[in-house]
C-alpha cells in the first residue's frame, strides 16, 4: 500500500524474461545506465559502475507495478487468489485458517515474508530481531526536482552511521529513495509508520543539498524499522517449504530480496517439471537454494557495515576497495544463473 521501488538485477530479469514478463516490466519501469557511489556530504563520486551496457538486464520499477504484472499473468493461467485466509496451523496435509476454513494440499509453500508464522512455528521457533537500523522510504515526482542528470541514475551516498539510495522508477517520472540510519530502539508496535519530514531532514541535515531537495519534495514518506532473522538451517520440513523473505530475509543493502524470491520460485517450478517425485524435488530445492540465500543474507549484513563506516581510515580503505573491486562485486552477485544451476544439479 505504501509503494516502494525495487531493483531487479540480471539474476532475476533473466528468469522474468524466460517467463515472458520482462518486456512488460521494462515498459513500466526504468533502465538506469549506472550506479554511482558517492560521499554523503558533498556527493563526490567514489565509484561509478555501468549497468545495461549490452542488454536491458537491470530494471528499476515500482513494486506495485511488478506485483500487478505478476498477478495478471498468474490469473491468466487460471490461478486463484483467496483473501482473508491467514494460516492458523498445519497438520499433515490439512491447512487451517483463522476464518474457520480448511483445505488440503500435498505441499505448503510459505512465502509469508520476514514475519513468517510458518517459519517460526515449524522451522526455528525464533522471531525477527530489530537490527538497530531504520529506513525512511519515499517517492518524489521528477517534475518537482531541479534539472539534474543525477536523478536519471542509481546513486548511493555513504556516510557515518547511515546511507541513502535513490533511483528512477515509473518511466523516470518518479524518484524512489531509501534513507537508512542507525537507531537504538524501535518501539512502534507496527514495523512501519507515517514518516515525519522534519525528523528526516534533521537526521540528515549534514548531508548534501541534492538529497535534502529530494526529501523535502516527496509526496510519500514512511519510516520502517528494519528487522532480521538468523540464517536458517533448512528450507524444507516434511511437506512445508519456505521461499523468499520467509526463507532468507535480508537487510536491503544489496537490493536482492525480491531477486532471490524470484530465483526461489522459478527454481522450484523448474525442479518440479524435471522430476514429478515431490520428495526428490524438495531435496533438490533445498540443495540448490539454502546456500545461495544464506550467502546473500550474510553479504547484505557486511555491505551495511561497510556503508556506515565512521572511522576515516576505514572509510579511506573502503573507498579504495570500491574503486578497485566495485564492478566485480556487483557481477559476482548478478551473474548467478538459476537456469544453469538447475541443469548442473546432479540427478
Which positions does each model-derived feature cover?
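Conserved N-terminal helical subregion
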Residues: 9-141, 184-201, 344-347
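Short helix-loop capping/hinge motifs at secondary-structure junctions, enriched
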Residues: 23, 142-150, 172, 185-186, ...
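C-terminal helical "tail/cap" subdomain of flavin- and related membrane-associated enzymes
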Residues: 27, 45, 213, 254-255, ...
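Short gly/ser/thr-rich secondary-structure transition/capping motifs
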Residues: 92-93, 148, 159, 221-230
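Conserved mid-domain beta->alpha element of the FAD-binding
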Residues: 109-110, 166, 199-200, 220-309
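Histidine-centered metal-chelating micro-motifs
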Residues: 115-116, 135, 162-165, 247-248
Amino acid at each position: 500500500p505504501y509503494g516502494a521501488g525495487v531493483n531487479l538485477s540480471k539474476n532475476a530479469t533473466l528468469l522474468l524474461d524466460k517467463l515472458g514478463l520482462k518486456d512488460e516490466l521494462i515498459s513500466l519501469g526504468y533502465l538506469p545506465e549506472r550506479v554511482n557511489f558517492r560521499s554523503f556530504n558533498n556527493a563526490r563520486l567514489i565509484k561509478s559502475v555501468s549497468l545495461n551496457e549490452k542488454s536491458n538486464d537491470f530494471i528499476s520499477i515500482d513494486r506495485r507495478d511488478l506485483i500487478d504484472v505478476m498477478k495478471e499473468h498468474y490469473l491468466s493461467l487460471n490461478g486463484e487468489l483467496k483473501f482473508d485466509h491467514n494460516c492458523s496451523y498445519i497438520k499433515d496435509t490439512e491447512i487451517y485458517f483463522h476464518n474457520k476454513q480448511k483445505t488440503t494440499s500435498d505441499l505448503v509453500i510459505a512465502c509469508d515474508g520476514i514475519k513468517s508464522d510458518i517459519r517460526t512455528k515449524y522451522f526455528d521457533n525464533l522471531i525477527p530481531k530489530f537490527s538497530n537500523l531504520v529506513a525512511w522510504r519515499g517517492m518524489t515526482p521528477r517534475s518537482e526536482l531541479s534539472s539534474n542528470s543525477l536523478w536519471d541514475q542509481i546513486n548511493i551516498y555513504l556516510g557515518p552511521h547511515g546511507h541513502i539510495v535513490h533511483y528512477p522508477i515509473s518511466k523516470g517520472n518518479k524518484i524512489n529513495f531509501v534513507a537508512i540510519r542507525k537507531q537504538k530502539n524501535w518501539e512502534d508496535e507496527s514495523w512501519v509508520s507515517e514518516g515525519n519530514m522534519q525528523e528526516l531532514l534533521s537526521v540528515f541535515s549534514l548531508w548534501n543539498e541534492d538529497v535534502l531537495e529530494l526529501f523535502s519534495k516527496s509526496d510519500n514518506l514512511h519510516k520502517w524499522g528494519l528487522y532480521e532473522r538468523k540464517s536458517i538451517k533448512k528450507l524444507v520440513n516434511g511437506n512445508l517449504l519456505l521461499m523468499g523473505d520467509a526463507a532468507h530475509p535480508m537487510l536491503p543493502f544489496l537490493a536482492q530480496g525480491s531477486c532471490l524470491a524470484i530465483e526461489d520460485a522459478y527454481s522450484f517450478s523448474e525442479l518440479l517439471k524435471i522430476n514429478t517425485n515431490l520428495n526428490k524435488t524438495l531435496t533438490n530445492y533445498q540443495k540448490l537454494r539454502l546456500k545461495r540465500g544464506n550467502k546473500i543474507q550474510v553479504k547484505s549484513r557486511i555491505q551495511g557495515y561497510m556503508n556506515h563506516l565512521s572511522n576515516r581510515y576505514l572509510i579511506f580503505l573502503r573507498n579504495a576497495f570500491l574503486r578497485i573491486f566495485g564492478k566485480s562485486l556487483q557481477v559476482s552477485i548478478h551473474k548467478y544463473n538459476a537456469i544453469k544451476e538447475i541443469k548442473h544439479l546432479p540427478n
